[in-house]
Amino acid sequence: MQYQHDSLDKLKLGQQTQYASNYDHTLLQPVPRHLNRDTLGITHTQPFHFGADIWTAYEISWLNLNGLPQVAIADVAIDFQSENLIESKSFKLYLNSFNQSKFATFEEVQQHLTQDLSNCAKGKVSVKLHPLSKYCHEPIVELAGECIDQQDIEINDYQFNPEILTNCTHDQMVKESLVSHLLKSNCLITNQPDWGTLQIRYEGKQIDREKLLRYIISFRQHNEFHEQCVERIFCDLMQFAKPDKLTVYARYTRRGGLDINPFRSNFEAVPDNQRLARQ
């Protein structure tokens, strides 16, 4: 997938950059959500009513007023209704700009993060900054649902194709949660692989699992940001499967000390940020 927009030409992603030595909020770079939503026809009205881009930031450090380095982990949730998503390399460079800057308290750092990310996203952003002692007790979890990956099928086409989902439902009405660890897409700018686990929770006519798995695997050579892939999956399932209720949730492996976990639903609230085995 290719988008033409001035905001993409200005991104630091894929370019050689220098790391800032002092706090600099201008390093954050937005990507308008409408770039993807225009192609899906959902710019003005989205088919999901709940959602966020859930980030975990593992590499946050700054100096206290005595010059002693401090470290923390942050949970960040960017509301799906924000005007922009935040480009990941710029987020990394922004976080690194804290490294040699002095702040009095955890709360001060958290306030800067919340304000700067909200301004960049042009929407609601929540930030929770945690000491490492808190994360020592965080479990590694599994996404609830039945894994559909162990199917005895042959795959020979890895080009994105939503038409795979044509006639993808059976008459039986179900309420189920399905999981696949085989989601792989590629960065829109750099083509680097993005690895994810996908959860689909729905109520409606039963979705054919073979067709669903083939559809998921068709993302393997597809170029889009994480958030855009999840919204595309949601829209394709609504178009072809027409469930009464639908949640699409992907948790991607981390890169540059950040993982991105987009969540979209038309019936349930954003979950807590809990990491998986590959995170």
Swiss-Prot record:
NCBIfam families: QueF. Its EC number is 1.7.1.13. Homodimer. The keyword Cytoplasm applies. One of its GO terms (biological process) is tRNA modification. This is NADPH-dependent 7-cyano-7-deazaguanine reductase. InterPro entries: GTP-CH-I_C/QueF, NADPH_dep_7-cyano-7-deazaG_red, QueF, QueF_N, QueF_type2. It catalyses: 7-aminomethyl-7-carbaguanine + 2 NADP(+) = 7-cyano-7-deazaguanine + 2 NADPH + 3 H(+). It is found in: Cytoplasm. It comes from Pasteurella multocida (strain Pm70). GO terms for molecular function: preQ1 synthase activity. Belongs to the GTP cyclohydrolase I family. QueF type 2 subfamily. Its main location: cytoplasm. Pfam families: QueF (PF14489), QueF_N (PF14819). The active site is at 187 (thioimide intermediate), 194 (proton donor). The lineage of its organism: Bacteria, Pseudomonadati, Pseudomonadota, Gammaproteobacteria, Pasteurellales. Catalyzes the NADPH-dependent reduction of 7-cyano-7-deazaguanine (preQ0) to 7-aminomethyl-7-deazaguanine (preQ1). NADPH binds at residues 88-89, 255-256. Pathway: tRNA modification; tRNA-queuosine biosynthesis. Substrate binds at residues 86-88, 226-227.
